[in-house]
């Protein structure tokens, strides 16, 4: 049984309002998938960009595989994302027209052991929106504490 890997981009939910989510496959080298299975990846500073009709994840950090030889991968390189043509067209259209952006939300392995990247079509939050979301989190946390105390 394979150990599942979940690497989250916690910053994305704070900085962006997520409109829609998609699950995409990633084109990886052998040493890259081995590093991901060990949990040695980071997607907090990464973003997605179109090059022609293809979508790439840029600035995704996957640590070099410790047992690799001279044919090891680069830690920060563009990685092609695999989506249906219909999904790519709709994403491309919405990014061009509405000023939205595509941000990686979660890097995980599925039940077959393949690496997948959950991406979100997002709109940037303003500073006052971020403050409001912080206030909502604080009030929710306080309510949970009160409920726990009386139960």
Curated annotation (Swiss-Prot):
This is SsrA-binding protein. Belongs to the SmpB family. It holds the Pfam family SmpB. It comes from Flavobacterium johnsoniae (strain ATCC 17061 / DSM 2064 / JCM 8514 / BCRC 14874 / CCUG 350202 / NBRC 14942 / NCIMB 11054 / UW101). The keyword Zinc does not apply. GO terms for molecular function: RNA binding. The keyword RNA-binding applies. GO terms for cellular component: cytosol. One of its GO terms (biological process) is trans-translation. It comes from the Bacteria. Its main location: cytoplasm. It is found in: Cytoplasm. Keywords: Cytoplasm, RNA-binding. Required for rescue of stalled ribosomes mediated by trans-translation. Binds to transfer-messenger RNA (tmRNA), required for stable association of tmRNA with ribosomes. tmRNA and SmpB together mimic tRNA shape, replacing the anticodon stem-loop with SmpB. tmRNA is encoded by the ssrA gene; the 2 termini fold to resemble tRNA(Ala) and it encodes a 'tag peptide', a short internal open reading frame. During trans-translation Ala-aminoacylated tmRNA acts like a tRNA, entering the A-site of stalled ribosomes, displacing the stalled mRNA. InterPro entries: SmpB, SsrA-bd_prot, SsrA-bd_prot_CS.
